[in-house]
Amino acid sequence: MIVAELRANEIVVLDRLREMVRLGSGLTPDRDLTPEIQQRALDCMERFGQRLRSLPPGSVRAVGTNTLRAARNSGPWLHRAEKALGHPIEIIAGIEEARLIYQGVSQSLPLDGKRRLVMDIGGGSTEYIIGIDRTPLQKESLRMGCVSMSMAHFGDGKISTKRFKRAVIAANRELEPFQHLFHSRQWKLAVGASGTLRTTQKLLHSRGWSREGISIEGLNRLVKAVIDAGRLNQSDFPELDPERFPSFPGGLAIIQATFEALEIEHMQISDGALREGLLHDLLGRINHEDVRERTVQALAARYHVETEHALQIQATLDMLLNQLAFSATLDRETAGQWLDWAATLHDIGRDIAHSGYHKHGAYILANADLPGFSNQDQLLLATLVRSHRRKFPAKLFRDLSAPWDEQGKSLAVVLRLAILLHRSRALTHVPPIHLEMNKSLVRLTFPAGWLEEHPLTVADLEQEAGYLAPADINLSFG
């Protein structure tokens, strides 16, 4: 955990807290988190929560990575963990993790226009990114990490030449399909992030095997020393934190495989990684430089969205939302932002087929790599788009994270109405409409005579009332 504040538009780190939970070590072959590891992680969230619970919403970002992506039973634990922490916890995709890692690392590197490789070893995944300056160009997240690799090949702590070779081969097999993308021919500088790589540098430096960073010669000597020791211990490796004993051999095998496959001669080490990337991403959101907005606009361009039509829907949304009361858990600005994004992207599915285009659009949004969006974010956006027309799938909102699981249904109805009112592209302006709304009642009041002049809108609203009725929502208008 990193605690920081903004001074003169610069991030100043105030405190760093770290606890070794090794969540991946508690993942069973059936992809369930054991009760013991759940409790250990929950206890950690309680301790972190003491520091963070008093901070205002929007000032904290907490993310879960590979293990929470893989675990089948992460949902109930996540709910308890968010309560303990006092803030939402987002599960992010591997590609999004890679983007954030690069963002964190690149802040400490010069803007020299040179291509660099960034590598980060986590507990259950390893990320590789090639980028220039602040821009990532190629990103991959491979399902191998220091914890998972150590459990698979060094579970009892014993290290031998045969075991280590098998671990290196296993890592090479994961890396093989992407070897050509990240080979040393593709970049000028290799940079490592994460505790495993920093620990490796520390071991090499203390032994005089590498003056700075990780050299291939020093790495080979360290691998031999680890194998000769037979198992990690304090007497042979006094610089190594005992908490890292269980996970370090697997991480070292991943480093060895990477150096061999990509023909790396030397790698420098960065202090920045995922947490620093999250800080800079959060700063961007605060300063209205939200990468999610760029992602939405890129999607809109890719799927040929009619920008003028989307803006008209957003204007009507704005008028309707201004008449609603909002709570502390979901403020007007946040609700408006999400509904604006959904309005922009609501018909991207037409690029696949007109029939069922709301379902096609939802599939794209749920499964595409969307920079800046967590898994829960993508599910929310997909649900809003899926529910914008035809039968109202109220049950989908139960799977959303708070507060959208409770309030999302009503706001989705507002989105439906705004889109419905602009169903005719010829109708560029909607008159002032009075909206009354609660969980089960929606009442629209139009200016006198307007509905009589727009019989198609009346027919659309009558049909909409039929769609909403099974969800126990009564729509009336006049």
Residue ranges and their predicted role:
Residues 471-478:
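A short amphipathic beta-strand at an alpha->beta junction
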Residues 3-8, 21-22, 26-55, 67-73, ...:
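Helical "lid/coupling" subdomains associated with nucleotide-phosphate turnover
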